[in-house]
Amino acid sequence: CAAIISDTLMFRSPTCTLSDKMAAGALALIAGINIEQFAKEMFKAGSNLKDKSPEEIFYQDYKKFIAEDEINFGVGQISSMDSDELAEIKERLVPFMVSECGRHGVTRVFFMLTNIIEESTELLYYGEGSEEMARIAFHMEPKDGVFDLKGVVSRKKQLIPALMEAAQAGQNDYN
């Protein structure tokens, strides 16, 4: 049940299927738990990052990608139900992202601060061409150095396809 709740962000991710909901419901009955309450406790415990370094937070859920054979970028993600916690993480991550860009072969870094309850993501970015890539991907301007992506919670189904398409569309504009 916990794995399904985690993978589907408590059934809010576009990756969630009817089978996920049915299986989680059946498992919750067997375990004798309330899914909503269990999910809140699980996400709260999983996102307790106060004692972690910016590096540990950044690489906790981080993946590298290559677009158009030459644009190397990395995307990390943290999901939380607590807006204050996400704001605190943001303050700690921005300076780290600056130092991390260029390491491990990536020239652009992105970080998703995903609010499960609001079903939205604040997308942090750093590196030459990263702002333009996100601007093309999401057809919007950043505000205070952040893209506020309403309805975007999935790196796999929403963020990466949009960034890949933007890389293809705007390759000559920001290489």
Residue ranges and their predicted role:
Residues 21-175:
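C-terminal accessory domains and tails appended to enzymatic cores
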Residues 1-23, 135, 157:
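Short alpha-helices
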